[in-house]
Amino acid sequence: MPLVIRLLERNICILLFLFLLLGNLLIEYAAYRKMPIVGGLFRRMFFKTLRRKEVIRNEFIPSGSVYILAAALICTVCFTQAAAAAALTVMLISDSCAALFGKFFGTFRFSNGKSLEGTAAFFISAFGILSVLAWNCPLSAVLLTAALATGAEFWESRLKIDDNFSIPLVTGFMLNLFYF
């Protein structure tokens, strides 16, 4: 996704992300309504990747992919190409690092269920990514952006905003403000 933003023209990215977002929403809604063909296919293909709240639900709750595509669309519209690509890179890599480190190495848990190790992995990877992709940006701005992105991930349940949506928006805003 970040590569698409960097390589394709902005308007093409906007149309592509809009098409994918609407298609994803329609397919997920069909799965929620248990529509025979689309719903069954969706459940067979993605059941193992969905979180518990996305599988067992009394109301339509979009999966993380909807939030990722919505964030990609908004970042592409609102931020520079470089900021949008960097923001999505932070979300894709750092959120994965946090989940993996938290799951396999997490020993100290906070009250929100997040682990110290996962949170540290998010911050370190976000700082590393931003140090490379925003190498001209002042170190203090990179640290602040990584810290705010980590906060968006850490406080996901309290903010009631999916971190796949909040991380790229916070990161992209800060990068546009400080650097791009």
PLM regions with names:
Residues 1-19, 26-132, 143-180:
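Interhelical loop and helix-boundary elements at the membrane-water interface
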